[in-house]
């Protein structure tokens, strides 16, 4: 089993990719417009979330993941790609017309003030082009991971497709639900 998860074997990770953003600041006053705190942001940290985090953790453990997911054609999608490339995660992210799923947290001191989520339920298109790309990426992988964070990438149809693919090719299948 140890050699299965060594760096020489590729692991296909399919699922919901998310950008997690943490804005750290300090509250110094209440807004005159509404009874809410005004947070002065001092530091911003962006991290990989969802299936992107799963793949990144594999890299940290000296594994070789191949990440497949969807991002929007927006700044958060670009930031996700930049983070993945910086961390050394092989990624094949399809751009679509939905916004990139992101979770932006505002933190003052040790208290999270609010979380702002940008997401739209999407259904991954089971088109022949996408399936051909998945087939090609899975070819050299010994393990398939389905990472479902409930954002729409993982549907019944794609789950069934990947389960049958793993079964028919003798690959190990791991399911990572939220």
Where are the predicted features?
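Ribokinase/PfkB-type carbohydrate-kinase core domain
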Residues: 1-28, 43-50, 55-178
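Divalent-cation-assisted or electrostatically stabilized phosphate/pyrophosphate-binding catalytic cores
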Residues: 35-42
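Flexible glycine/proline-rich, aromatic-decorated loop/lid segments
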Residues: 30-33
